[in-house]
Amino acid sequence: MVRRRGVVYYLYKESLRCTEGKEKIMRTVTLLTNALFAKQGEAFAPVALPHTWNALDGQDGGNDYWRGVGTYQIELPAPTKGKRQFIEFQGANHVATVYCNGRELGTHKGGFSTFRYDLTEAMKPEDNLLTVVVTNAKSDIYPQNADFTFYGGLYRDVNFIEVEPAHFTLLKDGTAGVFVTPRSNGKTRIDLFPVNADGHTVTVDVKDAEGKVVATGKAKAEAHTVIKLDVKNPHLWNGMADPYCYTVEASLCAGIDVLEVAPVDTVTVTIGYRSFHVDPNTGFWLNGKNVPLHGVSRHQDRQDKGWAISKADHEQDIALIKEIGANTIRLAHYQHDQYFYDLCDHTGFALWAEIPFISQFIPTKEAHDNTISQMTELVAQNYNHPAIFFWGISNEITIAGETEGLYQNLTELHALCKKLDPSRLTTMAQVSMVPMNSEHTYITDVQSYNHYFGWYVGDVEDNGPWFDKFHELNPDRCLGVSEYGAENILKWHTAFPDNHDYTEEYASHYHHEMLKTFATRPYLWSTHVWNMFDFAADARDEGGVRGRNNKGLVTYDRKTKKDAFYIYQAYWTDKPMIHVCGERFVDRAPDERDITVYTNCEEVTLYVNGECIGAKKAEDHAVVFKNVALKEGDNAITAKHGEVEGNTITVRPVAEHNFAYDVPEGNQGANWFDDPAAVAARKAMKFPAGYYSIKDKVGTLMANSETAAVLKDAMGKILGGSAFGMMDAKKQTDDNPMSGFYNMMRLTDLMKMAGKNVTAEMKQQINDALIKIKKD
């Protein structure tokens, strides 16, 4: 405990001691848990570390969260005589400049990787002050623009480290200075980087999961020391089925005869022995067995915490992802906490790890160098994790177009990954409109696309044909689905789900259709839902919710699993389960009384108020009981299969549809419910069968002269000539790739892109004109 300016600081200290009863402390790691913090121009105040200054304003909408400079002051422990001191930051977003007792130690650019500085020469016998100036303001550092909040601050652990003068380097790209390359046949190469180690010896022990030494070796310590070992018949790391891990304990000892000499430094890393490859027709193979990769993407933030989350938060996320039955995680869109990678090693998830080279390409040297730096740190710091299989070099980076500078940057990142780590594969997530034959689809080892057919554009049924066409045109390319999803807001409900209605029911329908699509396409090497959890995106304001992307299968606070969660569990897990959908869809009008059940059982029986209604066989892991009879008042509904019983929901019959379940026009959700008269006055749009409407695709509307005339008069004024020109269905997509993208969009989606320029009244007028025109 230390005291400064009337504030008490508690420090956590971890000591690494030598083995076999020797009591000499080799290195100490002290977790710094408190600081003084001030925004630019404001007074300092105590905060707990980890810390972000955007925990609340980064999630409340308005695209106005504070992006600027924050300063931290942290008192350091007194140095131990004869040792060297280092400071370690595991995450400081975006740029951090570090000072010790007023001496500048350096600046780190990149908000997601570990970095360290040597404090030794700046330290005093006591009263040492660390000052860290952090900024998340815009600069030539990635990410620049993206659909998530960039939380500022020291949001991960800060550690004070002491080591002997001779130690494994702490200054090699934020790593532990020990890199292990294990082969599935047991051949093991260890690259070690000791410093100040003349006259020292490096020893290495490989231990199995029970702690038994299965291989050992030693070598004279050199600046780059290489030791090669052979583990006989290694127990393979086999994903979720058997994530068996070994540990490598590397020690640095003074002298040549080290049997009786205590090590001066020891580093322990986790490894796994495995082999894998990806086939363009059959997908992912692990240790000679075909293992279809199906899983989720994950953002690291949480409600009211932002990125400053705890180990318990990481553990809960892992547990939820395991519960749904996933076997792969795309850790988007940046390097995640080392603790989460550790959890994945021991749980068995196959990981895609990536850098935040996202959305907007910056054609400057500083930005280019930052991609190289962030990729180097990502690969180096995560080299030993058996869970990682793929390095992601970018996400939707061609949104603003494909340029030669961007292409060169991407090819350089691919080459860098192969140089640093030839044992893994590279990938990238393409935005949907990238042509199937774009040169960008051939940069990385395997390819993935972010596709939202059925949400942003087109229909959910468009996904399968697109995958098939790509596979036909590129039979030797491995294709994956890096993102897909639909907004899923718990307060909106319908018995007639439709694209962009934001209801829980449409999201469930969408995800079920995607699962059916994937089930018949074994050539997809991976699929990753966007997203496992709702996350903050302060610029968002849609579906009656501000500041949030609601595509998660679990809510932002991790308290509620949405209905769509359970269709995945039904497909992906073997333990018998039953889930009755519609828990939040309580009021049911006469035509809204179907009950849907998700299950991995062959058959389920429905019970209403304890009475057996009947049994039905599951089809594609779902059962729909049509027009279930309800009594007045509350009705308790559940489903069973033998000893397996699902959840119980409560529904009640009402005479008419409850309009409180409908997302309002203009996304002003809160306003509708403040004034009941406004709800009653709403005019529902009509979409008569056999007639055109704003729900039709732009390409369809432009192909008909009458409907095209309606659009030209109405939309030309809003979008302008150039944007309207891109909508022309007669243009060749080779000349203008964006035209194909717009043609697949529903007119409602294009209106949405126009934002507030398209009012509810304008939508109504355009739709009224279109529904007068009969389809051929």
PLM-predicted stretches and their roles:
Residues I318-I321, T328-T560, A564-Y571, K575-A589, ...:
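Substrate-binding/catalytic cleft of secreted carbohydrate-active enzymes
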Residues A681-T759:
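Compact, charge-rich alpha-helical regulatory domains located at protein termini
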